[in-house]
Amino acid sequence: MQKINNIDGLRKLRNDFMESVFKEGIPRVRVCCGTACNATGSKKVIEGIKAEASERGQEVEIVKTGCQGLCQKGPVMTSEPAGYFYQKVKPADTHELFVNTYEAGVPARKLLYRDSILEEPYELMGDLPFYKKQLRIALRHNGLIDPTDIKHYLAIGGYGALEKALSTMTPEDVVEEIDRATLRGRGGAGFPAGKKWLHTKKAPGDIKFVIANGDEGDPGAFMDRSIMEGDPHSLIEGMLLCAYAIGAGYGFIYVRHEYPLAVRNLKIAIRQAEELGLLGEDILGTGFSFVLEVREGAGAFVCGESTALVASIEGDRGFPRSRPPRLSEPGGGVWGYPSNLNNIETYACVPPIIEKGSGWFRSIGTETSPGTKVFALTGKVVNTGLVEVPMGMTLREIIFDIGGGILGGKKFKAVQTGGPSGGCLPESYLDLPVDFDSLRKVGSMMGSGGMVVLDEDTCMVDVARYFLSFTQAESCGKCPPCRIGTYQMLGILERITQGKGEVRDIERLIKLGKFIQEGSLCGLGQSAPNPVLSTIKYFREEYEEHVYDNYCRAKVCSGMGVFRINLNNCIRCGLCKQVCAYDAVKETRNDFIIDNDYCRQCKACYHVCPVGAIKIWKKSLISLYERFEIPYEQLEHIERSTKMTLKDVLESKPSQMVTCTKDCKISDAVTIMDGKNVGSILVMDKDGQLVGI
């Protein structure tokens, strides 16, 4: 394509592509070629489609798109003109796809999404519960265009915001529009982008930089990666608008090298924009110049921190430094020049704000957190993937309406938001609106958008240990509170999860966590204790069980509990005896038993048992089980629902409102209470008779 020298040329070229690209009525498939779908075979599916089309002599346009969101069901694709949405497509399915979709004009039912095998499938993407409540702004082009073809981006109105800004708006107008939109940074801190832009604009000096933070290091988070892979021109246009607004001539996109597809697509997009005259010197003949390049990072989590990121761009080790000066001030940015730093999703939201206006953006979301947010929904949820929803949507809607609920019909336990620096929220917060301020108030954070769903089989102490082990390993080691404090906290957590917890460990964790928050230099250290402190706040009873009862209710931690064989379930296969390294499993004439004098709670027998006959019990409840013949599960239920140990219950006295009887069996009473799901207190006399409920 020939270089465009003026705004009219851009407008004409866009109109031409709108007419010539994506013509209506022709056979077309939009196949997801994001990282997740590539891993599940989308490239082979495309080869299968090409081979089938060639064999039939039929022309089918294939659009290799970015991530379409429903990563759990990849490879996914849509077929046009009917718009059928297909999931888990395999190369062998292409024949059926052509026979049904393009010959008979009906969907290939085998490939349609359905909630369960007994329910009717969904034909269109917009009808799926996963997509129905989503509203796409940052991901608006993902799944529609080929990210390596600038014609596709122009054909759907791309660079229209840049055209509008250069032709009808001053730099001050652009800054003011972003400020009025109250666009808050999507990288985690939630600082208003407009105020950051204005601060950089007012900084003295002719040389300024625009930086995009694509160093997405949170485990299980892939929001920014999907934008860079699937819609790189949206990012470039957002950075161009920022550069025009603040008077910057240079820019960097900082991406971790573990994102090879994102790096490839970004470099292709930059080259295409340069060839077309949308990057470089004298853009569209307006006198505005902007040079952009990709800088690859080595993958250190700390380089997501702004000052460490700048140091990495400059070629130094990614060490955070104290502020001021801020990045937007002289001496604070790249090579000392004022620099504006936002994350990928923030820049992707800028073009639609300029095109549609700040009022449109503020009409979405909440008053203090307008717009949408992209979340990487992962963990023990039916539908994992990328979701973009208006700010203020509740956790329940995201997890159960969009995510489809908990895998295997299990019970929801917690959700971890904000990545390794975020917090864990219990079931009581499912109706909490998701926005910056609401999450911060309850001890968590938005972060970059990670959302990990946890079920009843998850140990919250182990979750805290996992996230702290990540942040501790990623600490740069510059400041002692983070370097030494996280090491000490991790040591305590590892001791607790190995059944070696000490009485004062919980208070030590709280004290250390607060010290690290107050004394660390950068955001990584300041937020590192969040998973530990939030789990202690909301799941303290699990910590107490680990420390005081040597018991893990989720049966995750080794070295805890009393191992027993449920003889009613045992099939006498002998696998438990074969794997026991300590000869703790003994074989009698009719049964297998576990000798707890030899048992080291390694859980080898627990994992190998094919019928789940190995049970792990809390030692303090075994005597009650044996003495009163109360089912163990009911004992655990009563203890948890009363929020008291049965030892506390037995030592308590009945109140004046308690009806006392002396002829009631304890097992009968507990069965009645458990059946009604009543959290009750049992009081017995010295002979073991029930004297109060």
Where are these regions (language model features)?
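Conserved phosphate/anionic-ligand binding catalytic regions in large, soluble enzymes, centered on
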Residues: A36-N38, I178-T200, G299-A311, Q472-I484, ...
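Iron-sulfur cluster-binding cysteine motifs and their immediate structural context
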Residues: K73-T78, P481-Y487, L575-I593, A604-I622
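Flexible inter-domain linker/hinge segments
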Residues: K110-R180, V334-Y337, N342-G357
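Ferredoxin-type iron-sulfur electron-transfer modules in oxidoreductases and energy-metabolism complexes
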Residues: K3-P27, S42-K64, P81-Y113, A161-I178, ...
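Short amphipathic, charge-patterned alpha-helical segments
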Residues: G238-C242, M391-G409, A669
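Hydrophobic alpha-helical positions that pack around
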Residues: K133-Q134, V263-M391, G403
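Accessory "access/gating" subregions that flank catalytic or transport cores
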Residues: E163-P204, R362-S363, T368, K373-L377, ...
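Tandem CBS (Cystathionine beta-synthase) repeat/Bateman regulatory domains
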Residues: S620-I693
